[in-house]
């Protein structure tokens, strides 16, 4: 059974350990990640980008695949299924499909709109016992066809988003996805 990532991460913080979040793109990756998490007796977060969700024929398919694999492989460690860098509509689809955690990437919206959309999602996830991550300031590099410049988030904007009741905040700190180029001016 999928679990909400919030409790998993609270336990990790209290126990002074990390929880890996690995993006899945197919059955083979998912199986390898689940088996390794079980072997290491480690909770795990399975991330799914919108592109990967489409590739795997939809979010309901992803939920069915993960739940089926957890049952067939006798996975007993906590597993959260998390939408990674989701649009507002993608978040709603993942709620409906049965994900246990979503990330709303509203970093490309003006801050007032990001806050308003995030606030709406806070109410929705509370009704479904899900966790919600929100982003302020873009993460640089390229992931799933999305290219960011790696800006630093405004601390006041971070506080505004955090104050609406999210579980986790993803704040751009000049970092990027992928390999750092030799001339990178961030961190």
Predicted features and spans:
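Alpha/beta enzyme core
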Residues: 3-15, 26-52, 57-76, 85-187
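Boundary/entry segment of secreted carbohydrate-active catalytic domains
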Residues: 17-20
């Amino acid at each position: 059974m999928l679990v909400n990532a919030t409790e998993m991460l609270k336990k990790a913080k209290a126990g002074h350990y990390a929880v890996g979040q690995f993006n899945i793109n197919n059955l083979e990756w998912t199986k390898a990640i689940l088996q390794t998490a079980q072997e290491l007796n480690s909770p795990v977060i399975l991330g799914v980008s919108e592109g990967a969700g489409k590739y795997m024929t939809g979010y309901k398919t992803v939920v069915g695949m993960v739940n089926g694999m957890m049952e067939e492989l006798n996975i007993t460690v906590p597993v959260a299924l998390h939408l990674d860098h989701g649009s507002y509509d993608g978040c709603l689809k993942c709620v409906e499909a049965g994900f246990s955690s979503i990330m709303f990437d509203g970093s490309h919206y003006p801050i007032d709109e990001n806050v308003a959309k995030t606030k709406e999602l806070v109410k929705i996830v509370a009704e479904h016992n899900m966790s919600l991550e929100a982003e302020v300031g873009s993460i640089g590099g390229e992931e799933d066809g999305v290219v960011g410049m790696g800006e630093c988030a405004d601390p006041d904007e971070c506080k505004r988003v955090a104050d609406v009741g999210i579980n986790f905040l993803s704040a751009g700190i000049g970092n990027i996805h992928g390999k750092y180029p030799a001339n990178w001016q961030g961190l």
